[in-house]
Each structure stands twice: as structure tokens, then as C-alpha cells.
């Protein structure tokens, strides 16, 4: 856990100032006349016009200065950038100034501020999240949505908070065995939920930051399946969204994702008509969280599922953690080291049709699979890239 004591990074501060003053790195320059803020070129290494000798020179110089790279070593621009990014973010003497940076131009750059001695920028390794826009008057439906998501949209402090709070248990304390009025005697019965706490990561918790790409993609990938057949896919860039059958006329700023429309006479359409307020989903650096607002019984399977064959049913109006980034990264290290299987990263939600009489067997008519884009990206790394990542951990 990061302590409140300021982290001594005088070498980093002196080195940065010297490099900015030297003018030897294209694009690395002061951003104000008082020389309290500086720019760093931040072009993605995957861009076609990426020039390693120019766009990555500053990051490479830091790796060489720290003795983390010499000619012939594995690794590359993405690894070098990650090292410097983490060093700046952990330091109490630097603070990123996002409003002065430009990431949407041909030559993107970030701006960092040099803080005076004794000024602490905040908890090392954390990022501030813009608060939701406040309005003087909002509809009751919108307020309900935002209140419901408050517990799901957890503070995305990269990995530190997740790792520091592993003792809370993988289930997040949100899964219960009662699904309220939506359950019936013939519907899938929930199992008793037990504590699924796992052993904490043995080693440097901060080192897990190096597993993530310099600009990790926490977008949500959705696959819609009706009666065993894939009928649609979607990618959601926002941190939270709501899965619904029909667009809502409310003033809510939360993104709405519509289920694909089936034929009017299909059983799936009958089930979708009961979706009502739908499902809330939060996808952020902490992981994946869902909240069931509809009356339809929904079972789930995910990396954070409690022990037992299931089915595990989502409680009504409660936030449930289904995927935790910190656990995934821990298991990914073991997989790269040949000490375990590939970590699971996909979440499955099964929507059940209510039973109508003792002879009616509940049907799983709708399935939604979801995952975070960065997880698949990491699992698809080449052996050389895996070795480079392990060298940082």
C-alpha cells in the first residue's frame, strides 16, 4: 500500500529538467515561460508514422539512465514509455496536466507540471476521475440510475486500490442468494455464496502496472446470443452503460446499448419485453461490475464467480463484481511464467424465461458475453512480448 510519505524522486526531477533544457529530444520542451510545465511527445508505437529514434528517444534515454536497457536487450518503445509513465505517476514531484496536453492531433503530447518541494500531488499512482456533471434538476429516473451506478463505478486508481483491498474478497460482498420476487420454484436456484478471498499477490504490487499497455483500453466488448446464435456485437467506450431493449426518453447521460431486435413472434422478443429498466454495466480499471434492474432472472459465470457449479444469480438492485483487473494481471504473470493456465477474462450473463407451471422447464433464451478489450490484448502477446513484460515485473 502506498504510504502518505512523499516519495523521494530527486534523481528523476533533476534528470527531467536537464533533458528538457538540453533540447536534444524533439518535442520535449517547456510548456510555459516560468518553466514549471513541460511537454512529452506521446505518439502510440503502433502508428504508421511512428519514428522510434525520435518519438521514443526520451523514454529510451530514461531506461538507459536507470540501467534498465542496453543495446540488444528485449523490450521496445511501449516498455520504455511505461517505465517513465509509472515513474512520473508515482512521484510526488510531478503532476499531469491533462487540460494542456493534446492527444487528438497528429503529433500528440502530454504535459506534466513540476511541483514545488513540499507540495504533494496526491496518492502516488492514482488518477483523478472527473465527477459526473451536476444539474439543478434531473428526472427521478436519471437520479436512480446515477445512484445505482455509484457503487459500481469504483475509483479507477489503476491497480493499487484493487491490490490493497484483496482481503475484501473476490465477490465484492455484493452477491446474495435471494433474487426477490423474480424467482420461482422452477427457475434456477441460487447457491449459497461463500467467501472467495484469494491469497494476495506475493511480490511488488506496483510492478503489476507494467503489465498494462501505456494507454490501456478498458472499453467493453459485448456479444449478443439468442438461442445459441450470435446476433450482434458492440463495443462501448464509456465507463458505464445500460443494456436495454428500447431506448429510454430520460435525460440520463449514461450511454444506452440496445439489444438486437428479434422477430416479433420469437420467444426472445417476449423475454426482451420484460427487460424494462435493463442492466447497468461499469467497465473501468478496477474491473467489470453489473447491476440488475429488470425482473428477469439472470445467472452469471465469470472469473469472480464463487465456488460451486452454480447457477449464480444476480441479486436485484445490487452491484456485483464479476471481473477484477488485479487478479487477472496476477494470474497473467503466472501464465507467462509457465506456472498456470491462461487467466479467464470473459463474463457470461444468461437471461432466463420465467416458468409457467410445473411442467415448464426454464429456458436460457438470451446470453450476453462481455469482456474488457485490454485483457484479450494482453493474452495475445507474442512470446517475445511476454518475455519483455516479465522483465519488468
Swiss-Prot record:
Function, in words: Transcription factor that plays an essential role in anti-viral immunity. It mediates signaling by type I IFNs (IFN-alpha and IFN-beta). Following type I IFN binding to cell surface receptors, Jak kinases (TYK2 and JAK1) are activated, leading to tyrosine phosphorylation of STAT1 and STAT2. IRF9/ISGF3G associates with the phosphorylated STAT1:STAT2 dimer to form a complex termed ISGF3 transcription factor, that enters the nucleus. ISGF3 binds to the IFN stimulated response element (ISRE) to activate the transcription of interferon stimulated genes, which drive the cell in an antiviral state.
Lineage: Eukaryota, Metazoa, Chordata, Craniata, Vertebrata
Record: disease: Immunodeficiency 65: An autosomal recessive immunologic disorder characterized by recurrent viral infections from early infancy. Clinical consequences are pneumonia, bronchiectasis, and septic shock. Affected individuals have lymphopenia or hypogammaglobulinemia, particularly during infection, and impaired cellular type I interferon response. Patients may have adverse response to vaccination with live attenuated vaccines.
Residue spans binding DNA: 9-116
GO-annotated biological processes: cell surface receptor signaling pathway; defense response to virus; immune system process; positive regulation of transcription by RNA polymerase II; regulation of transcription by RNA polymerase II; transcription by RNA polymerase II
Family to which the UniProt record says this protein belongs: Belongs to the IRF family.
Keyword Cytoplasm assigned: yes
Induction record: By IFN-alpha and IFNB1/IFN-beta.
Chief place of localization: cytoplasm
SUPFAM superfamilies named among the record's database cross-references: SMAD/FHA domain, Winged helix' DNA-binding domain
Protein name: Interferon regulatory factor 9
Regions crossing the membrane: none
CDD domains attached to this UniProt entry: IRF
Name of encoding gene: IRF9
Keyword RNA-binding: no
Modified residues (Phosphoserine): 139
Record keywords, A-Z: Activator, Antiviral defense, Cytoplasm, DNA-binding, Nucleus, Phosphoprotein, Transcription, Transcription regulation, Ubl conjugation
InterPro entries given in the database record: Interferon_reg_fac_CS (IPR019817), Interferon_reg_fact_DNA-bd_dom (IPR001346), Interferon_reg_factor-3 (IPR019471), SMAD-like_dom_sf (IPR017855), SMAD_FHA_dom_sf (IPR008984), WH-like_DNA-bd_sf (IPR036388), WH_DNA-bd_sf (IPR036390)
PTM annotation: (Microbial infection) Ubiquitinated by Herpes simplex virus 2 E3 ubiquitin ligase ICP22.
Single GO molecular function: sequence-specific double-stranded DNA binding
Annotated organism of origin: Homo sapiens (Human)
Subcellular location as annotated: Cytoplasm; Nucleus
Region (Disordered): 120-151, 163-202
